[in-house]
């Protein structure tokens, strides 16, 4: 299947150094708000790439649940493939893609677990069925069929009809960035790329060639 004729010219916006915030987290928050206002589909969805102890990269899409001065927060099963990869190699790369705005944001950094209190607070805010699912799903494990999963979910619901506690193998991570890049599509593939990199605890802002 040939795909070389599929292309699009980007013309909607531009990105200049002088209009970028000094702090990349502030710049990200600005872009995220604009993505939400523009009704981008799943504006908080981000691809997260990890590398396990075997040296092989894997990626998947998860949802950003908080962004703050420290970094980017998401939640998952610690025993999942991504959880095992992060235990062996606590670094990750994130990518947000907002095609409606012809934008993407790349983030690289060190990953640490959130404390149990924060994980408990977020877990308690989830819908009941999602909390049940966190117990029922042994994420990334091979199962014989969907009925196995449904049976586990029914058992958990029967055991916890009102309140489902957080499983010890489920909780949050924060990606503490050392690099954040903002990409704005431009005509003729002369895209705008503004990268922030952390140098001696100070963010250095620079333009990259597309």
UniProtKB/Swiss-Prot annotation:
What is the recorded name of this protein? Pyridoxine/pyridoxamine 5'-phosphate oxidase
**What reactions does this protein catalyze?**
pyridoxamine 5'-phosphate + O2 + H2O = pyridoxal 5'-phosphate + H2O2 + NH4(+); pyridoxine 5'-phosphate + O2 = pyridoxal 5'-phosphate + H2O2
Question: Which PANTHER family does the protein's record reference?
Answer: PYRIDOXINE-5'-PHOSPHATE OXIDASE, PYRIDOXINE-5-PHOSPHATE OXIDASE
| Example GO biological process | pyridoxine biosynthetic process
Q: Which cofactor is essential here?
A: FMN
PROSITE patterns (alphabetical): PYRIDOX_OXIDASE (PS01064)
Q: Which gene encodes it?
A: pdxH
* Cysteine disulfide partners in this protein: none
Keyword Chaperone assigned to the entry: answer is: no
Coiled-coil ranges per the record?
none
- Enzyme class, UniProt record, top EC level: oxidoreductase
